[in-house]
């Protein structure tokens, strides 16, 4: 199995990213797909694109995908409150999402105080070394949703994580999500105005979390997210 990652940017501003874990015979088509995504993205044409291929040398940890909850009227404040995220922490998370800084990874905040707990600056924390497998093979999820669900499932695979809020920085995509092990994966429609680049990924955690261990899991442990519908 091989890990394949793509990142593209223009003048050091993030444009697009993608990754997966695949068999050797799928490398060529995966690289072509990531190349197309990186170079022909609505956020602009990059002046830098990097594709990294690395053989996986350790066991792959299986993670059960979060359940997708279909609710057109999902309310972010109610969802976060149900998961133990305070209004103060949510407001601080939205401040990071709406500021002009384009973060390439997630920001980790205290679910109580909203204080930032990681120290990775604009880079943030990146959930990497993962793949997504739909064992039902229905093909009923598009690529954007499978990528989001895979990341959300990895991020929430820890008992001290309260939940994750994600808002895409793509210009015309206005649907975000809030996901948590307790309540599943909820899409949030029209969470931002169209034709805006603001966005981000916020992870709300208990203050007692072993941050170094958690970050190592997200960034270094090979993970396979398994999606199964009943």
Swiss-Prot record:
User: Does Nucleotide-binding show up as a keyword for this record?
Assistant: yes
Which GO terms of the molecular function aspect are on file?
Answer: 6-carboxyhexanoate-CoA ligase activity; ATP binding; magnesium ion binding
EC supergroup of this enzyme: ligase
Q: In which pathway does it act?
A: Metabolic intermediate metabolism; pimeloyl-CoA biosynthesis; pimeloyl-CoA from pimelate: step 1/1
Q: Which domain of life is it from?
A: Bacteria
Query: Subunit details for this protein?
Result: Homodimer.
Similarity comment: Belongs to the BioW family.
Q: Under which name does UniProt file this protein?
A: 6-carboxyhexanoate--CoA ligase
Species name for this entry?
Answer: Staphylococcus aureus (strain NCTC 8325 / PS 47)
Corresponding gene? bioW
């Amino acid at each position: 199995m091989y890990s394949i990652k793509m990142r593209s940017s223009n003048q050091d501003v993030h444009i697009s990213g993608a990754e997966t874990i695949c068999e050797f015979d799928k490398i060529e088509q995966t690289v072509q797909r990531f190349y197309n995504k990186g170079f022909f993205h609505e956020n602009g044409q990059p002046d830098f694109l990097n594709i990294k291929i690395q053989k996986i040398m350790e066991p792959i940890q299986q993670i059960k995908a979060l359940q997708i909850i279909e609710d057109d009227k999902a309310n972010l404040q109610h969802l976060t409150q149900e998961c133990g995220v305070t209004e103060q922490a949510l407001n601080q998370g939205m401040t990071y999402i709406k500021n002009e800084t384009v973060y390439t990874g997630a920001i980790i905040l205290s679910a109580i105080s909203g204080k930032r707990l990681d120290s990775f600056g604009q880079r943030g924390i990146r959930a990497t070394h993962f793949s997504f497998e739909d064992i039902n093979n229905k093909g009923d999820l598009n690529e954007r949703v499978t990528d989001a669900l895979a990341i959300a499932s990895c991020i929430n695979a820890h008992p001290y994580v309260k939940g994750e809020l994600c808002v895409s920085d793509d210009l015309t995509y206005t649907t975000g999500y809030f996901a948590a092990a307790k309540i599943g994966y909820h899409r949030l429609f029209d969470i931002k105005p169209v034709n805006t680049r603001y966005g981000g990924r916020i992870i709300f955690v208990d203050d007692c979390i072993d941050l170094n261990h958690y970050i190592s899991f997200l960034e270094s442990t090979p993970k396979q997210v398994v999606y199964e519908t009943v």
